[in-house]
Amino acid sequence: IAGDEINESIALYLKKVHNLVVGERTAEDIKIKIGSAFPDDDFDKTTLEVRGLHLLSGLPRSVTLTSGEIREAMAETLSKIVEAVKRTLERTPPELAADIVDRGIMLAGGGALVRGINDLLSDETGIFTHIAENPLLCVVNGCGEVLDDFKKLKRVVDTPEFIRNAIRD
């Protein structure tokens, strides 16, 4: 489940509710500008004028959307993210679970930039959730570190024996 699925849910909502067809880039722009995962009375009133093609006439048309409306459009996909996190936590080994309770959940990737997603996950799991310092690059930077020094992989993951044998000191 990723940001692309959230974009698709926004585009589908616009098609169903407003008879407005928008492209992937417009849906992403809506998500970035007024998308939110957690209620915020002030931000929920934020509006954005969006242009697209009217589904029935085929002519260009614009509609004004609110942040609260877009949160509802994203709700099903956000619910899938919450459920995936909960399922993962349920399967987490006790030692790691204790670490997560102490340190919290760290969000990375473009989805971490959805306004309020950390608040939503904190609220739903009861575990403090924060966003990585550079969520768009931190995963690839970490992979780069492991590739530069493959022995670091042993400290990060429970690696299969054939990999442990390949990276022995």
Regions found by a protein language model. Give the residues of each.
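Residue-level signature of catalytic and energy-coupling elements of molecular machines
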Residues: 10, 85, 107, 143
